[in-house]
Amino acid sequence: MPRYVPCILLCVVLSWAGIGCAPKLLGPTTPSGYRYTLSVSDPYLWINAPGTLPRSTAVIVRVQNAQGQPVDGVPVEFQIDPSWVQNASITPQRALTQDGSARAIFAPQTTGAARITVHVENIAHETAIVVQSYSPPQGR
């Protein structure tokens, strides 16, 4: 149990940081004045997990104009922290919004806390994803 304490504490901190009901509205960007939200479909992933546990996750950006309407055709860039480049992928790395949304799939190959940075015009924002190794329950 003591070896899992750091991972458990990291999960608790990340859960606490993401408790808000709605994603934080970021921006306005320059020059367009857009605002955007950043969310992750599954902030906790598992390596070597059975079929029901998530092994990859969608990183989702929603862009809106000053009136709150979704904006199409806005370039969004998704970047993995340099320390994760050899151990994970994010596809695509650039996307244009459709119906105000752009998404990329993050797929890790190792455990740890991965950071993804999203750029919309001049505004960048980070999110963290926790990747754990799956250990099947042991019989007693």
Locations of regions flagged by a protein language model:
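The feature marks long extracellular or luminal low-complexity segments
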Residues: 18-140
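Sec-dependent bacterial lipoprotein signal peptides
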Residues: 1-21
